[in-house]
């Protein structure tokens, strides 16, 4: 049976979080509610999750030796990656030595790289995906695009939040897309995936949680992206029963293959009753921020329970709900947010400000949340709230 000790004592249950953005911050808050001792690690100081953890370390998490040193110093019971850009080979070694990585080190390694997870889904599991090719050079990228046809997508195999992604409408776009992908990759210049276009009706995130009692699914989350970056999400996304059943089949297959415990954000394309696998994150998903108001147990509460081996007997969806991001553009280390009385004036609205220490360019700094009697009404309410936030740099 699971047991949780006293934080900052010899009996403490220690979790080391790798990556301290807004998703990690909400997870730490849920872990704190269970009395877990949390150590937060990221490449910069005062990251959001560090502000609610017991202590923190600043290091380059792609540096395997530095990551190993802090893990051996802290001796956590669980290592929980919150981002892709981690020395996953070191996590594999540490897992072999007896550490527990959530959900598994293999899951972190495969999903850090679009090639690993795409080959698992399409070639090993036989799941429907968009047609694709990988390319290491501009010439290979051009050949792949010409073979797949236009429009098509070019993405770095290692990136997140839409960085380095572009849509090619013709062969005239290939050179610029290649350079953009090289600039946007997490590990610098390198391999890209070229994907054929799928004419889908909508895309969803199916939040899938593997826990002590089995596998559970949240209601599907619909979302709107711009340049690969989430702008809005809503729950529940209406789906044909056959499409929802197929989405669950695909999500179950890929999460079973990855194994371990925790929440997974399974991204899927849907057209009518057809469903295609797109990507998977073995951790809370940014589009799942809507669950802060749409469910009795948010994706972060579900992840915390799953990690700790606690039961998840039911997930209650509370009705139409939506999220809309608060974007800040400019240069500042002292951003302030005003007009909050108007932001929160409507019933059933909420606001989360992430507390990020600065902005350089464009950055997601908060999210507005809303519930209403329909998805459209909830979306409009969330968008109004987000737009009402007054930014001062």
Curated annotation (Swiss-Prot):
Signal peptide residues on this chain, from the entry's feature table: none
GO process annotations (BP): 'de novo' IMP biosynthetic process
The keyword 4Fe-4S is annotated on this UniProt entry: no
Binding site for ATP: 114, 155, 160-165, 195-198, 203
Subunit structure as annotated in this protein's UniProt entry: Homodimer.
Function, in words: Involved in the de novo purine biosynthesis. Catalyzes the transfer of formate to 5-phospho-ribosyl-glycinamide (GAR), producing 5-phospho-ribosyl-N-formylglycinamide (FGAR). Formate is provided by PurU via hydrolysis of 10-formyl-tetrahydrofolate.
Family under the similarity heading: Belongs to the PurK/PurT family.
Protein name in the entry: Formate-dependent phosphoribosylglycinamide formyltransferase
Taxonomic lineage of the native organism: Bacteria, Pseudomonadati, Pseudomonadota, Gammaproteobacteria, Pseudomonadales
Gene: purT
């Amino acid at each position: 049976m699971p047991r949780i000790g006293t934080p900052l004592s010899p009996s403490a249950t220690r979790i080391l979080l790798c990556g301290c953005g807004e998703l990690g911050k909400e997870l730490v808050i849920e872990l704190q509610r269970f009395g877990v001792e949390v150590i937060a690690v990221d490449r910069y100081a005062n990251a959001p999750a560090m502000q609610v953890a017991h202590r923190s370390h600043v290091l380059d998490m792609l540096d395997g030796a530095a990551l190993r040193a802090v893990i051996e110093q802290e001796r956590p019971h669980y290592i929980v990656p919150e981002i892709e850009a981690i020395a996953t080979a070191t996590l594999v070694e540490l897992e072999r030595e007896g550490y527990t990585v959530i959900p598994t080190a293999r899951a972190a390694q495969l999903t850090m790289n679009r090639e690993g997870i795409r080959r698992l889904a399409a070639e090993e599991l036989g799941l429907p995906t968009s047609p694709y090719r990988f390319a290491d050079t501009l010439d290979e990228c051009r050949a792949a695009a010409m073979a797949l046809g236009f429009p098509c997508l070019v993405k770095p195999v290692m990136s997140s939040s839409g960085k380095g992604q572009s849509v090619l409408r013709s062969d005239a776009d290939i050179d610029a897309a290649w350079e953009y992908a090289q600039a946007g990759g997490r590990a610098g210049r390198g391999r890209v995936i070229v994907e054929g276009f799928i004419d889908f009706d909508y895309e969803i995130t199916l939040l899938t949680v593997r826990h002590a009692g089995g596998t559970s699914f949240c209601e599907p989350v619909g979302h709107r992206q711009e340049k690969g970056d989430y702008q809005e999400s809503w729950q529940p996304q209406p789906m044909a029963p056959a499409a929802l059943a197929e989405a669950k089949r695909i999500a179950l297959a890929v999460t079973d293959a990855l194994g371990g415990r925790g929440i997974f954000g399974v991204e899927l394309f849907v057209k009518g009753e057809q469903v295609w696998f797109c990507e998977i994150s073995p951790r809370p998903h940014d589009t799942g921020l809507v669950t802060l108001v749409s469910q009795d147990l948010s994706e972060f509460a579900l992840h915390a329970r799953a990690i700790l081996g606690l039961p998840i007997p039911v997930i209650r969806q509370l009705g139409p709900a939506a999220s809309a991001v608060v974007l800040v553009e400019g240069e500042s280390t002292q951003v302030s947010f005003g007009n909050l009385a108007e932001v929160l004036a409507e019933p059933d609205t909420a606001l989360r400000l992430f507390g990020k220490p600065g902005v350089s360019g464009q950055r997601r700094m908060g999210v507005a949340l809303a519930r209403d009697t329909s998805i459209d009404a909830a979306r409009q309410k969330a968008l109004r709230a987000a737009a009402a936030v007054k930014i001062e740099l």
